């Protein structure tokens, strides 16, 4: 399981898991799994990045892979 900076980034934006999930159109369970280091699809990463106000090219700021 790889680590990522999703939880740290989300919390710094004062955003709940539920709010991020709603904005990214994914389930809160998906957000939890990703924050715990589980892998996810590229499309899910894209949705999360956009919900955080980032561009797909900024994926290195959140995800290691």
Would you name each region that the model predicts?
Residues 18, 28-29, 57:
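Key DNA-contact positions within bacterial/archaeal DNA-binding proteins
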